[in-house]
Amino acid sequence: MQGLLIVDEDLVSRKQMADMFIESGYNVTVTNSVASALYGILKKTAQVVLLGTKFDELNAAELIPLLKQCNQKLSIILVAADTSLLRIKKLRAEGIFYHALKPVDANDREEILQAVECAFKNMEKLQTADK
């Protein structure tokens, strides 16, 4: 089953996204804890991560390299509204798969849904190529 981890401090946002992805058939885990996020990645229950910008004591720029050290094949989708272009470029270099604006309406949620679908398809292609 396709495991999706949603890591965000915003409870309302986490719940909205979790509901949307559960309805779409994904196995969803939600957390606002860095420790829980790392645990899910190390246990390989999540292949794709929707990452907010801040949680616990770390921000996304500090957490992304840690997540990638745990699983190089992990697809990370950064969900942030107020991130500068320079920071996005840096985070892309760190290994994010996609950057999406925080959803405010149905169109925005559809964009994130498509990004997650694309991330899973990309992972399947990479796994097939490795065989």
Give names to the regions the model predicted.
Residues V30-V48, G52-F55:
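Acidic, metal-coordinating helix/loop segments flanking the phosphotransfer/catalytic sites
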Residues E62, D82-L101, E110:
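Alpha4 helix (beta4-alpha4-beta5 surface) of REC/receiver domains from two-component response regulators
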Residues L42-K44, L66-K73, E94:
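Conserved phosphotransfer cores of two-component systems
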Residues V7-D8:
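Conserved acidic carboxylate
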Residues L11-T29:
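Two-component/phosphorelay signaling modules centered on CheY-like receiver
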Residues Q47-L67, T83-R87:
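Conserved phosphotransfer microenvironments
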Residues E111, C118-K131:
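CheY-like receiver
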